[in-house]
């Protein structure tokens, strides 16, 4: 499978756009998740997608250094998370994928949605809707841990 190059996607669709400006809507196959993650969060489709709209949101709302870091590490955060939490109802997305990279925690929110196909079948699709560096030590304190990489089970 061809490896996704988010910096290239950024250059093609996002770079140089004005804040809040619309972008050409593209859905990008970001990566496939692992079987362990599929079982842990009970999803049926291993493919994880990202839209240019979500990427534009990150570009408009994150500091440049953080956005650049996310461009280069989003696949790793989603494909190999250290922990997965159930996202809060007040937050966008169903799951919070968390990974520690260079002594900082990063969170990517994954939303699972059902899409009607032209043949009438329904397909589950998974989208990254946002990502950011977790700045507050207690940010995840009230989130429910669903899975962690170390034990392949939630810790108590």
Language-model features: locations:
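Ribonuclease/tRNase effector modules and their secretory precursors
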Residues: 1-156
